[in-house]
Amino acid sequence: LPEESGSVSVEIVRQVSDETLAALTVLLPQLSASASSLTRERLETVVAAPGTELLIARTEGAIAGMLTLVTYTIPTGLRARIEDVVVDHSARGRGIGKALTATAIDIAEQRRARTVDLTSAPTKTAANQLYQNLGFTPRETTTYRITSTRPADSPNTRLAQQDESP
């Protein structure tokens, strides 16, 4: 990599630069209003995490989008998941999301992942159309989430309580 797609290039972030940190700091709020601010330390943790690839897309040299690909092994095999896909609002409709997602699929296939999953809000019409055009099919499933209320650096009391059971 980098992989070119028209005037869009996609690359895996191997080291955090000031440019990458600044661009992702602008992109993340466009993805989630509730996302906490991105620090260099957190971004370096993401980049260094085993099984996690942070992809960025450039157009005209500037970072205009990002995607995170996570691969993990479970008893049924190697799986992949696409998360945190966002293209800068000023650059949408130029094939950046397609280039990012296609590159992530290629990486997952090279690693022999059995499946690649992602979620997308039904209101994101263009994104859902893109994913279907790339071969994703909707699954009949319900996504559940529990949101932690404790700080990231606090001990996991639920597990600690289970360990202390008679």
Descriptions of predicted regions:
Residues 45-56, 81:
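A short helix-loop-beta-strand connector motif used in the catalytic cores of GNAT acetyltransferases and
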Residues 87, 93-106, 129-133:
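Conserved acetyl-CoA-binding loop-helix of GNAT-fold acetyltransferases
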Residues 72-82, 92, 139:
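A conserved beta-turn-beta hairpin within the catalytic core of GNAT-like acetyltransferases
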Residues 1-18, 149-166:
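Conserved N-terminal entry element of GNAT/NAT acetyltransferase domains
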Residues 15-45:
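Conserved GNAT-fold acetyl-CoA-binding loop/helix
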Residues 56, 62-71, 81, 86:
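Conserved beta-strand in the GNAT
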Residues 108-120:
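Conserved GNAT acetyl-CoA-binding A-motif
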Residues 98, 122-140, 145-146:
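Conserved active-site alpha-helix within GNAT-family acetyltransferase domains
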